[in-house]
């Protein structure tokens, strides 16, 4: 049997599986060291490449998975703003951390979800209502650049969507987190925020 994975490993396999050039480079680096305790020279080189390539990036930090990255982003947003609530898209996925889970899931306690607010994708009226009601408590708004639920069709942002979101977040001291784990470099090598016309100047905060 032959199988065609149209989901591309949930996003990152944009060059396909068993790509000989990529596999060779990965094996070469593996032989030089795997899971080292401190940054290796190649990690520094990659960080410099990323910050040069992504206009709004002042620095790069590596994590072992997307959930670690989004969790750290949430922590930074809370520390920066002094606020606690998280605003996200219904059915959006940003990892397996407690704040991302359905409150009825086994092992999830009330405190995991009581600081989380959810709105529908592409609904600016609903977004504005949340900001009006909870803006002083919301630390961040986290979303993928376009909606790509697991078992439904993807949906692009409507015209002006992200510019409106960015403006409202800036006005209300809300950190805007664009989760590019599944979409990064697929839309634009500078990051999907570039294609969405977000962050028109370096270092938006």
Protein language model annotation of sequence segments:
Residues 199-204:
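Conserved small/polar residues in nucleotide/adenosyl-binding loops
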Residues 20, 78-83, 101-107, 160, ...:
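A glycine- and small-aliphatic-rich helix-loop capping segment at beta-alpha/alpha-beta transitions
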Residues 80, 171-172:
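Helix C-cap/helix->beta junction micro-motif
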Residues 144-158, 174-196:
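Conserved PLP phosphate-binding loop immediately N-terminal to the Schiff-base lysine helix
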Residues 48-143, 147:
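PLP-dependent aspartate aminotransferase-fold enzymes
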Residues 4, 89, 178-179:
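Active-site flanking residues adjacent to catalytic metal/cofactor-binding acidic residues
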Residues 2-80:
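Glycine-rich loop-to-alpha-helix module at the N-terminal edge of alpha/beta enzyme cores
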Residues 162-170:
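Surface-exposed amphipathic alpha-helices with a cationic face
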